[in-house]
Design a protein with these regions (language model features):
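Blade/loop signatures of beta-propeller domains
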Residues: 1-26, 54, 303-305
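Beta-propeller domains
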Residues: 17, 42-71
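Beta-rich, blade/repeat-based domains predominating
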Residues: 22-24, 30-45, 72-91, 96, ...
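Predominantly a core beta-strand signature of beta-propeller blades
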Residues: 24-25, 65-67, 105-107, 167-171, ...
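Structural recognition of the beta-propeller blade-terminating site
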Residues: 51, 60-61, 100-101, 163, ...
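A short loop-to-beta-strand structural motif that recurs across blades of beta-propeller domains
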Residues: 56-58, 96-98, 158-160, 207-209, ...
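Beta-propeller blade signature
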Residues: 104, 151-165, 207-212
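Short loop/turn segments immediately following beta-strands, especially the blade-tip
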Residues: 210-217, 297-304
Length: 305
């Protein structure tokens, strides 16, 4: 049932324990064209996110508001932090995954697989063993809007793992149509990956899949975790109890570890991605089309640097 003037919709009573009845949706920034890739820097007390078509990474701080963190971001999309706290970014224009070093220099983590250029890396996570996992759909090479139109060199749209010791890149899943957001369960025994192919083909997949992680390197037992009925799934994050908070066209939907839809936070724009942040990691930051929003929730995001 709707709550708080329509902010929440509850589909399972378990959602009541996750929402805060007096919380409201705060708009923190606007003026983007397609806002994506939020990542919280707890040590700096700020949020970074991508504005893909405007080719920039923006920063929001509670004290000072919005500023440009990086112009000419190579149409950056997904962002995360590695275990040393460094920014790891997916770039559409250059078709690569990069790391920003403490001195501001850029290190290329991955730009080719078997000698061929990647499509347009979309989203990325870093496991506790320092391995880097990312998705590589073709959105950034389909048009000039969020990258540069180009021929696809890879034979498909894959999910990759970068070995932390050798830098070797390996395909871990090869049967997605358009792999997109991804996140590990709190214990890292499951990797969740969205397939957002329904954005361009109504008959294509529009769901989030789950895979068991074997030996920290391989994925097995792939299955559909949940089907998204309100647009396509894009980016998502996990809370400490294993609930999955995903972007949809209607807002942010929360799914229990058993795959049940618990509830929805309604957002007035199409949501692309989310992340937990704030001093207690209980504030959900939401990148949605032209804007950055935030809402307090009664849970905590999985701890990251």
């Amino acid at each position: 049932m709707p709550a708080n003037d329509g902010l929440y919709e509850t589909f399972d009573k378990r959602f009541h324990s996750l929402m805060i009845g007096i919380a409201h949706l705060d708009k923190l920034a606007d003026g983007c064209v397609w806002a994506e890739g939020p990542v919280w820097f707890a040590d700096g007390g700020y949020l970074l996110w991508s504005d893909i078509p405007n080719n920039r990474i923006l920063r929001w701080m509670p004290e000072t508001g919005v500023s440009v963190f990086r112009a000419d971001s190579n149409n950056s999309n997904g962002n995360t932090r590695d275990r040393q706290g460094r920014l790891v970014t997916c770039e559409h224009l250059t078709r690569r995954v990069t790391r920003t070093e403490p001195d501001g220099s850029i290190t290329v983590i991955a730009d080719r697989y078997q000698g061929k250029r990647l499509n347009s890396p979309n989203d990325v996570v870093v496991k506790s063993d320092h391995s880097i996992w990312f998705t590589d759909p073709s959105y950034g090479i389909l048009t000039e809007f969020e990258g540069s139109r180009a021929e696809q060199e890879q034979g498909g749209c894959y999910v990759y793992r970068v070995d932390p010791a050798t830098g070797e890149i390996a395909v871990v899943v090869d049967d997605f149509v358009k792999p997109n957001g991804l996140a590990f369960s709190p214990d890292e025994k499951i990797l969740y990956v969205a397939d957002s192919a329904g954005s361009h083909d109504p008959e294509a997949p529009c769901h989030i899949r789950a895979f068991d992680v074997v030996d920290g390197k391989r994925l097995v037992n792939g299955r559909v975790f949940c089907n998204i009925k309100t647009g396509v799934p894009d980016g998502f994050r996990m809370d400490v109890n294993g609930n999955l908070w995903t972007s949809t066209h209607a807002g942010v939907e929360c799914y229990a570890p058993d795959g049940a839809l618990l509830g929805r936070i309604n957002v007035p724009e199409i949501v692309a991605n989310v992340c937990f942040g704030g001093t207690r990691r209980n504030r959900l930051f939401i990148t949605a089309t032209t804007s950055l929003y935030a809402v307090y929730v009664n849970t905590t995001g999985v701890q990251r640097p």
